[in-house]
UniProtKB/Swiss-Prot annotation:
A motif ('KMSKS' region) lies at residues 330-334. This is Methionine--tRNA ligase. It catalyses: tRNA(Met) + L-methionine + ATP = L-methionyl-tRNA(Met) + AMP + diphosphate. ATP binds at K333. Residues 593-694 form the tRNA-binding domain. Homodimer. It holds the Pfam family Anticodon_3. The gene is metG. It comes from Methylococcus capsulatus (strain ATCC 33009 / NCIMB 11132 / Bath). Residues 558-579 are annotated as: Disordered. GO terms for cellular component: cytosol. Is required not only for elongation of protein synthesis but also for the initiation of all mRNA translation through initiator tRNA(fMet) aminoacylation. GO terms for biological process: methionyl-tRNA aminoacylation. Its cofactor is Zn(2+). NCBIfam families: metG, metG_C_term, PRK00133.1.
């Protein structure tokens, strides 16, 4: 075995504004399995997490309940920990981002970034609730969709037609908090200059720290150009005040990942561990983040950029997983498939049934996984009970009934028939299964383990110990003793391989077999001669389909959202739209200044790709009496062939600019934040090339 590795593992921090549901549990079960496997291998592996406790939703929910935010997050922390414990998620530390440890690290990192010139303040314009006297996040503004005119749509996207937009695009907007019409108000915000970290991030995202599909996804952001990141919010806000900026608070997505450091700092202080050994720039420890693919932007761009430029180490790997569907569809309250962890446990379902089923579906990619409730019942009953548990239940009773629970037998019968060949096969599979666990291909591990279980069951079916037990001669008793001993050794090996997934069942098996806690290395040994076992007790029951029906019924709710409570914010939407906040109007200029700009109608005579350029298209523009060549940064939004023949507006008297790819003789006008959201301006019908725009 290789020397022990020093490993720190995190899962994304659940938001302290709601219950844990089965979708959340995909990630925590995935992480817990991986951590348990590493610990079984003898590695020094620490697993930390925390509640994500800051932000406007926390503040407003606490206000609605008539309690302080601190009281709310303390209660939710207890609920989350209860649910995780119920599903056997075993953290080394489960903490809160609302801690002095996280506050100190946030202030430290902010100060280091500021010292390096990566923090900038600037005025922005946002919607403000004049009744509550607070700036409103996108999801706390509703109005009429500017495209399909659906009523009561959120401030960042329409759930009817799917259009995304800025809150200021809404028709007749109103505050979800007070119902008042919001007004635009200017405020100074603090920005992290993420764009200046682009070259580092391009290298880091291609370094092997990400899954291939994750790295490819991030390429889209690089092509669009990285925007500076707004890291501040205005009072009133529940969070950490920015040092030297009274009334300004760190945005929740700045201190949330720093919560990993805060939780680990708390663990270090309690156990006497060296924090710097894990987080310093040249650390030899391994750092792994398990996350959902919806927060990839924050963890794979914002977070490593912050760490790198504040003098800390970056993650060894980031493992992103897909979303959970139930019966092939999004979880639904009306269909009863938006199932909370608490409800699952209260309905009496075994948490290890779900751990096993998720393991059957999980792999090392970002693919979504589906919880088919019918398949869930069938697979657990067939695999766990019908194959695995069945092995012990069909043989253990004979050992205690006829042999006083003793397993002191040879592995070969008097007539020379060897029965230990299957033991070698199972032992030799340890490294293959180990590789699957390490790469998070749990579905492959399960497939292999169940193939081995099938072979063991074939062995038992061929030997028929229940038939042998009916015969009372000495040969039959000896044969029965060997068959049972072999079978229980095989059962023990299968238990080792399943232990990361089924820790409580493995504990029960350890008690039944009277053995210490199983490690991965134990796959190379057998139960010793003369070993005694306890009486067999039933290890697991089958799922009754009626239990699942009752679970669904218990979770069936109306689709109508709770009044005044917006749906949880989408980190993806926030990442894509935060730069769409209305920018302040530029400095006033005179009419004489504006008159200097010669705007003309131009027809795009030709458009083509520019070899070696990620963002540019080469446009040949017809101005009526002459043609111009312009290099325009619109490649991410337009295919060249779709532009040919189109009319647009250009700045005709802009000084020619010599570029790497040629001379650009003007500028076309477009709106939008960039990336795929670039909108080329077009004149109304009747305009002709060369006409002056007045």
């Amino acid at each position: 075995m290789t020397s022990p590795r020093k490993i720190l593992v995190t899962s994304a921090l659940p938001y302290a504004n709601g219950p844990i549901h089965l979708g959340h549990l995909v990630e925590y079960i995935q992480t817990d399995i991986w951590v348990r496997f590493q610990k079984m291998r003898g590695h020094d592996c620490r697993y930390v997490c925390a509640d994500d406790t800051h932000g406007t939703p926390i503040m407003l929910r606490a206000e609605k309940e008539g309690i302080s935010p601190e009281e709310l997050i303390a209660r939710v922390h207890g609920e989350h920990l209860r649910d995780f414990t119920g599903f056997h998620i075993e953290f080394d530390n489960y903490y809160s981002t609302h801690s002095e440890e996280t506050r100190a690290h946030a202030a430290d990192i902010y100060g280091r970034l500021k010292d390096r010139g990566l923090i900038e303040s600037r005025a922005i314009e946002q919607y403000f609730d004049p009744v509550k006297e607070m700036f409103l996040p996108d999801r706390f503004i509703k109005g009429e969709c500017p495209k399909c005119h659906a009523k009561d749509q959120y401030g960042d996207s329409c759930e009817v037609c799917g259009t995304t937009y800025s809150p200021t695009d809404l028709i007749n907007p109103y505050s979800v908090v007070s119902g008042a019409a919001p007004v635009r108000r200017e405020s100074v915000h603090y920005f992290f200059k993420l764009g200046e970290c682009a070259e580092f991030l391009k290298d880091w995202t291609r370094s092997g720290a990400l899954q291939t599909e994750a790295a490819n996804k991030l390429n889209e952001w690089f092509e669009a150009g990285l925007s500076d990141w707004d890291i501040s919010r205005d009072a009133p806000y529940f969070g950490f005040e920015i040092p030297d900026a009274p009334g300004k608070y760190f945005y929740v997505w700045l201190d949330a990942p720093i919560g990993y450091m805060g939780s680990f700092q708390n663990l270090c202080d309690r156990l006497g561990l060296d924090f710097a050994e894990y987080w310093k720039k040249d650390s030899e420890a391994e750092l792994y983040h398990f996350i959902g693919k919806d927060i990839l932007y924050f963890h794979a761009l914002f977070w490593p950029a912050m760490l790198e430029h504040s003098g800390f180490r970056t993650p060894t790997r980031i493992f992103a997983h897909g979303f959970l569907t139930v019966n092939g569809e999004k979880m639904s309250k009306s269909r009863g498939t938006f199932i909370t962890a608490q409800s699952y446990l209260e309905q009496g379902l075994n948490p290890e049934w779900l751990r096993y089923y998720y393991a059957c579906k999980l792999n090392g990619t970002m693919e979504d996984i589906d919880l088919s409730l019918e398949d869930f019942v069938a697979r657990v009953n067939s695999d766990l009970v019908g194959k695995y548990i069945n092995i012990a239940s069909r043989t253990a009773g004979f050992v205690t009934k006829f042999f006083d629970g003793r397993l002191d037998v040879p592995m070969q019968l008097a007539d020379g028939e060897a029965l230990d060949f299957l033991i070698d096969r199972l032992r030799d599979s340890a490294e293959e299964i180990s590789g699957y666990y390490d790469s998070r291909d749990y579905n492959k591990a399960i497939r292999k383990i169940m193939e081995l279980a099938d072979e063991v069951n074939i062995f038992v079916n061929e030997k028929k110990p229940w038939e042998i037990a009916k015969r009372d001669d000495s040969y039959s008793r000896g044969y029965l003793r060997v068959v049972c001993a072999i079978t229980l050794n095989l059962f023990r090996l299968l238990t080792i391989y399943l232990k990361p997934i089924l820790p409580r069942l493995a504990e029960a098996v350890e008690g039944f077999l009277k053995i210490p806690s199983l490690t991965w290395q134990d796959a190379q040994t057998l139960l010793p001669q003369g070993h005694t076992i306890n009486d067999y007790q039933h290890l697991m029951t089958r799922i009754d389909p009626k239990q699942v029906d009752a679970l669904v019924e218990a979770n069936r709710q109306s689709l109508q959202a709770t009044a005044g409570q917006p749906e949880p914010h989408s980190q993806v939407r926030h990442a894509e739209h935060q730069q769409r906040q209305v920018q302040p109007i530029a400095e006033t200029i005179s009419i004489d200044d504006f008159a200097k700009v010669d705007l003309r109608i131009a027809r795009i005579a030709n458009a083509e790709h520019v070899e070696g350029a990620d963002k540019l298209l080469k446009l040949t523009l017809d101005l009526g009496g002459e043609t111009r060549t312009v290099f325009a940064g619109i490649k991410s939004a337009y295919a060249p062939e779709t532009l040919i023949g189109r009319l647009t507006v250009m700045v005709a008297n802009l000084a020619p600019r010599k570029m790497k790819f040629g001379l650009s003789e003007g500028m076309v006008l477009a709106a939008g934040p960039g990336g795929g959201d670039i909108f080329l301006l077009s004149p109304d019908e009747g305009a002709q090339p060369g006409m002056k725009v007045k």
